[in-house]
Amino acid sequence: MNYSAMIQNRKSVHAFREKEVPSEAIGQLRSYYEKTCPRLVPEIATELIVLDKDAQPALESSAGYNQFLIGAPHYLLLMSAPHSYAGINAGYMMEDLVLKLTELDIDTCWMTFTDSDKIKKALSLTTPLEVAAIVAFGYGEKTAKKLRLNILSMSQIDVRAEQQYYAPKKGVHDLVHMGSWSNKSGLDEMMDFYDDMLWQSFYAASLPPSYLNRQPYGFLVQDHSIYLVQQEDAYTDNLDAALDLGIVMLHFSAVASQWAGQVRWELSPAAPDGLPEGLRSAAVYHM
């Protein structure tokens, strides 16, 4: 998969057509999940469940933002064994499946939820695994044209029209800090040293969806280590925060691995020096 292209092409849609996804494409997704989909924490047991539109009435009472569920022809449920890293692992895996669906020209939308047991009861699921992530998928309704910046490198920007809603996000210079939190001095020089490759990884990490587009995280670069730092956010609960972290880690890892080899994250490392109160070191990657 060309992760850089899929990350730039993915979009969250909020209205789906009734057209169903062909069974062949769903079969490809299942095969990808079983054979290829990366696991952040491989020892956590997971299961992928594909639901059709008949599941919508059951989900409407148990999932969606403030119980508002986006109707779709299909839904993905990622089930997980209970684990302290179940949420972050689910975000990592499910976002990879979202990018696979993007490669198959299928649209998606992450769904929020708060109660796994309520969803399992509504769907009559008897598995001991818990609901860890939900994504609606299908073919999105066409929307008004919006300009999208397709940024190929720090100096090459392609402006194109795209059929999607526009949601502003923090850019690389907002997310990445050098040496100490809020310091930007030396950031551009570091990016230049890696000949745009590191910048592309951070750019990919600036694009993922997050709950209400809050992006309650950032990166702190110290020496040859990159820390993913979680910020307190009154609007984001623990489950959505964990999913958000997994998603952003997948985006960074998928692009960085194209030039740095396999990216291995250490979860919950000791806090780096100078991290302000209210911030938590969620993971670290040693280059």
Give the residues covered by each predicted segment.
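Acidic, surface-exposed loops and disordered segments
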Residues: M1-M287
